[in-house]
Every structure is written in C-alpha cells, then in structure tokens.
Amino acid sequence: MAMNDDALGLDEAYSVKTPEDNKRLYAKWAATYDSSFVDAKQYRYPKAISEVFDQVVTDSLSRVLDIGTGTGLTGMYLSRLRPDVVLDGMDISPEMLGQAKLKKRTDDSAVYRKLYERDLTRAVPNENAPYEALISSGTFTHGHLGPECLRNLLPLLANNGWLVVGVNNEHFESKGFAGELDALVALGAIKAPEILRIDVYEPGSVHYGDQARVIVTRAIN
C-alpha cells in the first residue's frame, strides 16, 4: 500500500474501530512506521513519555511493562534513561512486535526481555506479572484503547506499582477518562492521579501543538 503524507498515518490510525482493524493497519505499517511517521512527522511521544517516567518515578525499579509496545521506541528511550530496568512489552500486532524485537540498548543488547502478542481490550494474562511499573505512549487514543481498558492493566501491577500512561488529549475528554479514574480511586484500586500534559510532536512539525495527557498514579492491590 502506498504511503504518501498521512495516507498511513493519523487519519487511518484514528479511523480503526476494532482490534482486527488495528492488526490489519499495523501489519501494513510496521516495517516503515519509524521512518514514514515517527521521523517524517517529528513524533516525540515515545521519548516524551520516557522522560516523564524518569522524572516522576523516583523509585529504583527492576521490571517494567511497556503497554502497546509498537515498534519499541518507548522502551528504547526508557532503556537509555534507566539502563538497569528489565523491560517486557505487549502489543496486538505481531508485525510491530517484530520491529520492537530489533531495538537495541546502548550496549547493543535487546531492549526487551520478552514480547507478548495481546489484545488489551480483554483481560490480560501474563506469567511475568506483577510489574513494578507500566508505561504507555500512543495506545490510548482514537480507535485504540479507551478508559475501560485501564482495569485490564491494573492486575499486572504490584501493590504500589506505577502507572504512567499517555492519552490523546481529545480522546481523554471525549471518552471520559477523568470519570473512570475517579471511579478507580473510589474503588480503592489506584491512588489519586496526577495529570500532566506533554507535546506529542517536535517544534517544526506540521502537527506541533498537539498534546497528550499523562496519567501518573500508583496501584493499590
């Protein structure tokens, strides 16, 4: 499929409706995602989330799970900031996970220890849980994961484990993430979250000014 401008980009990514739509889109896009979108559009979301994680997570962690791993950019950037952290990843697309498997740390070792093909709209089995933290960028957005999926992720966290999750700004408002977070606090499932804002694109990008919210909270298990 030809990829010119955003032909395979924001418009198509935001238009998917089902997990199968996601798998079809990213099967086409995986091999060129980093070059045709991340580099071409100056997309800094994975780097920005990793920087927020490094700033707000004050604990020394050993095991982190990357939710919606994609091509592995979030893990790659986090591994540079936290070189001692063991990273696992989950994504619905085997083709994207294939690209993530190729990502390297600065010492040329693999970024990820294990990669799992998972549909995150359902309960998520994982034999390596619980993790000390979950990180995610670009997954909670139009056509992808809604606020209800947060409940599927919490069982993967250890008690007091960190959740650092980016959410598309418009998606956060239209899908009622604030209400879901309030409900989780009321249930005693999470601590009161801090909501930050970050730029998704670099200055100079045609999309500069687009922002995401970052949910920062801790699990109570």
Where is each model-derived feature located?
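A short glycine-rich, Lys/Arg-flanked "PGG" loop and its adjoining helix->strand segment in the class I
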Residues: 148-159
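Class I SAM-dependent methyltransferase Rossmann-like catalytic core
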Residues: 30-44
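Conserved beta-strand signature within the Rossmann-like core of class I S-adenosyl-L-methionine
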Residues: 160-168
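Conserved alpha-helix/loop element of class I SAM-dependent methyltransferases that forms part
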Residues: 42-61
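Class I S-adenosyl-L-methionine
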Residues: 189-221
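N-terminal, positively charged/glycine-rich alpha-helical extensions of SAM-dependent methyltransferases
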Residues: 1-32
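Class I SAM-dependent methyltransferase SAM/SAH-binding core
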Residues: 63-124
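A short acidic, Gly/Pro-enriched loop at the edge of an enzyme's catalytic core
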Residues: 124-134
